[in-house]
Amino acid sequence: MTTAVGTPGSAITQRVHSLNRPNMVSVGTIIWLSSELMFFAGLFAMYFVARAQANGNWPPEPTELNLKLAVPVTAVLVASSFTCQMGVFAAEKGDVFGLRRWYFITLLMGAFFVAGQGYEYYHLVHEGTSISSSAYGSVFYITTGFHGLHVIGGLIAFVFLLIRTKVSKFTPAQATAAIVVSYYWHFVDIVWIGLFATIYFVR
């Protein structure tokens, strides 16, 4: 007579497999992100209205956007979507160590993006482009600033998730939380690609 013996890791994996089916948390997150999409659509509309009403150069002098900084910073943020998804794959397998590793890397990459954005803000303000200096300054800081706040919100979510998986046993609920955070992070990345293309290339 044979007795099947299961390991804790395999038990977690079996329970986590159920996460591939839609659940209320995931559906609720997708609905919320849809409302966030409408919010950013309004910001894009504001930017294009300001651009249409502007006379002369866009952006106006003395604004000089730092494309050489923006490109690598953007590349890092886009790459962070891939590291985030690797964390999701680990969570779906019940691999908490892989989840922590990939999400910590994603956290560092997101922090790099925020630091890069802050660096560009510093130089723009130093050169005379502030939120009150022109219509361009207003729409630039409002659109990128709200996106930056969303990135910071994602970083906070990563920190809480990493702490949660460290101080307690890894559960399907934590795996669900990891997947939900990934939805948010992918959304933030996609929004930035649109903002980057609009701000740095639409003249």
Swiss-Prot record:
GO terms for molecular function: cytochrome-c oxidase activity. Its EC number is 7.1.1.9. The chain crosses the membrane at residues 30-50, 69-89, 102-122, 142-162, 179-199. SUPFAM superfamilies: Cytochrome c oxidase subunit III-like. It is a multi-pass membrane protein. The keyword Coiled coil does not apply. It is found in: Cell membrane. Keywords: Cell membrane, Membrane, Translocase, Transmembrane, Transmembrane helix. GO terms for cellular component: plasma membrane. GO terms for biological process: aerobic electron transport chain. It comes from the Bacteria. It catalyses: 4 Fe(II)-[cytochrome c] + O2 + 8 H(+)(in) = 4 Fe(III)-[cytochrome c] + 2 H2O + 4 H(+)(out). Belongs to the cytochrome c oxidase subunit 3 family. This is Probable cytochrome c oxidase subunit 3. It comes from Nocardia farcinica (strain IFM 10152).
